[in-house]
């Protein structure tokens, strides 16, 4: 993942940060799956959904929250508390809000140029999924 175009994340709404963060997580998961699993695109997509659904992101955030810095926790809470008109079909409102907060944090880190931190959190998370796989 390359350095993003410089955008001041403070100028974006929490939901705009979550929009970016959703793409960051999606790209990381897709890349890791494609690199380590030789299967059809359809099967890769089935696997991907296990990691990028609102329910999965809720569990991921719960695993990582103890590692968040004070600033990261504030950004997560800002995203979690953002007003939502809709919720995911297969997730509770709590899960959906937490997943939005997690996406907001990833978008904020990415747009702040903190790619090492994005990878650090993702690698920690991925070790929970499959301890035998590395970046």
Language model features: what each stretch is:
Residues 1-135:
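Double-stranded RNA-binding/processing signature
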């Amino acid at each position: 993942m390359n350095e993003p175009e410089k955008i001041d994340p403070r100028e974006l709404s929490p939901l705009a940060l979550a929009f970016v963060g959703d793409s960051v997580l999606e790209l990381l998961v897709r890349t890791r799956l494609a690199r380590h699993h030789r299967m059809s695109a359809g099967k890769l997509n089935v696997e991907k959904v296990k990691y990028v659904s609102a329910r999965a992101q809720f569990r991921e955030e719960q695993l990582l929250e103890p590692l968040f810095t004070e600033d990261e926790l504030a950004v997560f809470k800002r995203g979690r508390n953002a007003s939502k008109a809709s919720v995911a079909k297969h997730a509770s409102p709590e899960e959906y809000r937490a997943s939005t907060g997690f996406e907001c944090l990833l978008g904020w880190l990415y747009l702040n140029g903190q790619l090492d931190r994005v990878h650090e959190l993702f690698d920690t998370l991925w070790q929970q999924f499959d301890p035998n796989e590395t970046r």
